[in-house]
């Protein structure tokens, strides 16, 4: 008799966090320079050794609270030892479109000859002209280095893997494989998909794929996990702004409704700006009924509700809401008698804008009433503590340079529901 598969899924934003995936800073971050960090979506270069220490502290503090933390480099190291998994990755990652005609065989051969840990590091960290021995591709590599420079990338690095929240999102009993907005991030989804497809942590688990396929061109449909929050009661909050498009939201809603995975989507129409690139940069749950928000953006959110309706075109009803976003979320979760408690970004207008920029509202809940946030957001952390929230702090000096806090740096895989 076969063992019953473990059920994976995320059923709230503040219930007990059981299992999570992270990605430590590494080679990809050592590739960041003042001339390329903007293209790679970082605001500045980072001190990588310190960032690694700070990230280890982040992981340690989660583990101390009983969270099973999976690290992406380790997961990739495991699966590239499987010939089938390695072939699946390289067939998609090393092509004429990605590395150019004349280098596919050479780059692939070189990668296949690496030790598994080094191979995993290069899959995330990218391959520069100086990495590949001249003996591999001889004349082509010599020409490449001469005209493009030793630091030019044959495969670009993926430093934003640090923000595992975005590439996939677990919604109740399944997961989405997200088509990312920026080209600099699209290869991240491929690697995460490989982990779900081949790693024993996931091959022995029970879950469904709701949406997305890294082998498919999704066109204008883009979806990122920082915009997606399964909050409970069959409700999913989805931000629609800079990174997540209406095209993807509509398709995801259809799929969730058809499979009975969700009952209602609350869409948050966000202003398009880097400071509010995702919903979780201005709004996150800290407890069953407490959220932290950046009011300057949240008050501008235009909410509407999508519900299944077989009498409507495409099987859905879309209803704009007159009430504010916070009022809509509060009523849908708590009913009309209770209201969400709201902690706004702290300090005067200057301090609040600075703390939002430094991810003061981007905290991750480990259980109801316990969150991890950046130490530098002293005003907001103080207000959260006064509201009864335990705030565990980590250093923001290096980790925050890519514009992401504890919420962004975690991809919850198993999280308990909350009783509403």
Swiss-Prot record:
GO terms for cellular component: cytoplasm. GO terms for biological process: arginine catabolic process to ornithine; arginine deiminase pathway. The active site is at residue 408. InterPro entries: Arg_deiminase. Pathway: Amino-acid degradation; L-arginine degradation via ADI pathway; carbamoyl phosphate from L-arginine: step 1/2. Disulfide bonds: none annotated. NCBIfam families: arcA, PRK01388.1. It comes from the Bacteria. Activated by Mg(2+) or Mn(2+) and strongly inhibited by Zn(2+). Its EC number is 3.5.3.6. The gene is arcA. Coiled coil: none annotated. This is Arginine deiminase. Keywords: Arginine metabolism, Cytoplasm, Hydrolase. Homodimer. It catalyses: L-arginine + H2O = L-citrulline + NH4(+). The keyword Cytoplasm applies. One of its GO terms (molecular function) is arginine deiminase activity. The keyword Hydrolase applies. It is found in: Cytoplasm. Belongs to the arginine deiminase family. It comes from Pseudomonas putida (Arthrobacter siderocapsulatus).
């Amino acid at each position: 008799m076969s063992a019953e598969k473990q059920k994976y899924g995320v059923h709230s934003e503040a219930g007990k966090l059981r299992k999570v995936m992270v990605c430590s800073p590494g080679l990809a971050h050592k590739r960041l320079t003042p001339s390329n960090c903007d293209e790679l979506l970082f605001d500045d270069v980072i001190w990588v050794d310190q960032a690694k220490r700070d990230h280890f502290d982040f992981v340690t503090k989660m583990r101390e609270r009983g969270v099973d933390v999976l690290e992406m480099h380790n997961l990739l190291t495991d699966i590239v030892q499987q010939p089938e998994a390695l072939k699946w990755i390289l067939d998609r990652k090393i092509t004429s479109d990605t590395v150019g005609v004349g280098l596919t065989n050479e780059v692939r051969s070189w990668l296949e000859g690496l030790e598994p840990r080094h191979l995993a590091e290069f899959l995330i960290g990218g391959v520069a002209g100086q990495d590949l021995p001249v003996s591999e591709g001889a004349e082509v590599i010599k020409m490449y280095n001469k005209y493009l420079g030793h630091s030019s990338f044959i495969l670009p690095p993926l430093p934003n893997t640090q923000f595992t929240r975005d590439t996939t999102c677990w919604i109740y009993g399944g997961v989405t494989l997200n088509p990312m907005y920026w080209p600099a991030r699209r290869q991240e989804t491929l690697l995460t998909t490989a982990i779900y497809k081949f790693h024993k942590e996931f091959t022995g688990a029970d879950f469904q794929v709701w949406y997305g396929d890294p082998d498919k061109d999704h066109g204008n449909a883009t979806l990122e996990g920082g915009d997606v929050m399964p909050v409970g009661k069959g409700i999913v909050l989805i931000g629609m702004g800079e990174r997540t498009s209406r095209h993807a939201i509509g398709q995801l809603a259809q799929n969730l409704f058809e499979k009975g995975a969700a009952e209602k989507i609350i869409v948050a129409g966000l202003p398009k700006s880097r400071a509010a690139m995702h919903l979780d940069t201005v709004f996150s749950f800290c407890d069953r009924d407490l959220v932290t928000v950046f009011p300057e953006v949240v008050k501008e959110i235009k909410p509407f509700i999508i519900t299944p309706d077989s009498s409507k075109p495409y099987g859905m009803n879309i209803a704009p809401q007159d009430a504010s976003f916070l009022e809509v979320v509060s009523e849908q979760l708590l009913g009309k008698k209770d209201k969400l408690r709201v902690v706004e970004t702290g300090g005067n207008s200057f301090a609040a804008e600075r703390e939002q920029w430094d991810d003061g509202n981007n905290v991750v809940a480990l259980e109801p009433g316990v969150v991890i946030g950046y130490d530098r957001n002293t005003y907001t952390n103080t207000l959260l503590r006064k509201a009864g929230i335990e705030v565990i702090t980590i250093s923001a000096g290096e980790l925050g340079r890519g514009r992401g806090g504890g919420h962004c740096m975690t991809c919850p895989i198993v999280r308990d529901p909350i009783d509403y």
